[in-house]
Amino acid sequence: MSKTYSRKQRREFTDANREAWDEAAPVHAKSNQSRLLEAFSTPGYNTLDDHCLDRLNEIGFQGKSIAHLCCNNGRELLSLKNLGAGPCVGLDASAPFIAHAEELAKASGHSDVTFVTTDIYDIPADRSGPYDIVMTTIGVLGWMPNLAEFFDVIRQLTRRGGHVFIEESHPVLMMYEPGEGTDPSYLKHSYFKEDPWVEADGLDYYQGEKYDSNPHYSFQHTLGSSLKYECLR
């Protein structure tokens, strides 16, 4: 069972994480923004994994309205737009990442893609949908202090008869720590860990650059606790 935090505690976590992601934005941009700007100037450019795109094709996203929660620099949402999605909205807490998304949207030439800076738990009323598809991509759930509230946000955003699309890694991976050098990963954490992980060595998952960052918090949610919500039934 995932631990539940008060609204004040939850906001402290999400504010801290936002500050850490704001710091990470220029680090990420140094690795890929120029390349992505050039790539998105090409019609039909797509960054989505094949298995992710296969599932979205099964849903039938072409012409549908899509909200992407925690969209980062918008590359996945813009990929869907390039492949025929309808009006799209990307939402993320980090203003610098949203600025990168807006640059990519301009390069892609799409006028009906909007990016909004917002705490995911407090989405403004004028962006509350409903949408045909509400989606998150890999890594999002672990940043959510309170899953029940997060899935309630998803429920409110999704139109009746719409689709919720979640691409996520299995939480068992969070039980492991990477080994040193060529040493294998090793089991360290409980699958049922309740307290958050606290790290302050950056968020560069492109080049693996370590830097002193604001502390950021991630959370272990079991597979069962992630699948029990009504909007997923």
Where are these regions (language model features)?
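A short acidic, Gly/Pro-enriched loop at the edge of an enzyme's catalytic core
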Residues: 121, 125-134
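A short SAM/SAH-binding and catalytic strip from SAM-dependent methyltransferases
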Residues: 132-148
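Class I SAM-dependent methyltransferase SAM/SAH-binding core
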Residues: 65-123
